[in-house]
């Protein structure tokens, strides 16, 4: 298995969650601890693991794909129960609750964030930093008195922006500053549509030797969503060594907006060539060359 030199969500943690306030779960209702309830849900994910070459997800257990999972039960859009898991839990990916007979809305989430998302509102699931590769399921279920065991298929719920710096990073670069406009860390699981946009300025990311690829994730708020990304490398004395503006980057659900560009060539902004290329791990790649 090849491991690309990629700085993943350290940056996304700072960019995406900045202006959308993360609201902690209400303390009046704690998550379910039922082991053998009358609803048992097992999640499956048959998409190739993002960033891994020549290896199918079918061979990768969920606890190697994600670090956290949540199952949330709503009735008439009101949350009635939920379960949060971490990948060290026994039977990670299988969750159980005990419910009164009736019809419910089921949401299942899988991600690798540092905290479980806020799930109080059925139509607004909010993630804290960092936003990672998120998979989700939504559907209606009918629960009776007898045990009901179901399997659900998770689908990717985000878009990804991948920046590949094509020139050498000067030795005197100490950290990067990213300004990112037009992203979302909240979405409606019933539609997989992102809800709010965020902007964050002046976030300092320490340079990691050899890392020239950065991956950022966002929920997609609509077909016309455009993202502006400004990148600058600074010296230890906080002098700008090089900078680049990437305006109007389109993002689409389950697609990668891939940017191949120099950052330290002295050109602040340039034209883009855009093409869509099929990819095994995502629905497609929107390829930008600056």
Language-model region placement:
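Tryptophan-paired
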Residues: 60-120, 172-253, 280-290
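C-terminal motif of bacterial Sec signal peptides marking the signal peptidase cleavage site
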Residues: 15-18
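Short amphipathic, basic-aromatic surface patches that mediate peripheral association
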Residues: 24-28, 34-62, 165-169
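Surface-exposed interaction/gating patches
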Residues: 156-174, 183
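Intrinsically disordered, low-complexity repeat and linker tracts
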Residues: 20-34, 262-290
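Conserved "repeat-terminator" motif of extracellular CCP/Sushi domains
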Residues: 151-158, 216-222
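Bacterial N-terminal signal peptides that target proteins for export
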Residues: 1-8
């Amino acid at each position: 298995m090849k491991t690309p030199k990629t700085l993943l969500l350290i940056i996304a943690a700072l960019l995406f969650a900045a202006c959308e306030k993360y609201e902690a779960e209400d303390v009046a209702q704690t998550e379910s601890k039922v082991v053998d309830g009358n609803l048992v849900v097992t999640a499956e994910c048959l998409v190739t693991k993002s960033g891994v070459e020549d290896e199918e997800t079918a061979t990768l257990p969920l606890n190697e794909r994600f670090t956290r999972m949540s199952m949330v039960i709503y009735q008439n859009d009101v949350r009635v129960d939920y379960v949060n898991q971490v990948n060290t839990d026994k039977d990670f990916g299988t969750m159980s609750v005990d419910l009164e007979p009736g019809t419910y809305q089921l949401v299942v989430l899988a991600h690798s964030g540092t905290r479980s998302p806020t799930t109080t509102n059925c139509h607004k699931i909010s993630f804290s930093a960092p936003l990672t590769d998120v998979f989700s399921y939504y559907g209606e279920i009918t629960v009776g008195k007898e045990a009901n065991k179901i399997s659900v298929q998770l689908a990717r719920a985000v878009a990804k922006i991948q920046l590949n710096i094509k020139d050498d990073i000067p030795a005197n670069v100490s950290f990067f500053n990213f300004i990112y406009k037009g992203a979302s860390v909240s979405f409606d699981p019933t539609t997989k549509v992102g809800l709010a946009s965020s902007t964050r300025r002046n976030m300092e990311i320490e340079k990691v030797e050899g890392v020239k690829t950065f991956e950022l994730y966002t929920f997609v708020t609509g077909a016309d969503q455009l993202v502006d990304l400004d990148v600058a490398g600074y010296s230890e004395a906080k002098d700008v060594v090089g900078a680049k503006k990437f305006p109007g980057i389109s993002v689409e659900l389950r697609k990668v907006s891939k940017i191949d560009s120099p950052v330290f060539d002295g050109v602040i902004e340039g034209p883009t060539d855009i093409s869509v290329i099929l990819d095994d791990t995502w629905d497609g790649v929107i390829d930008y060359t600056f």
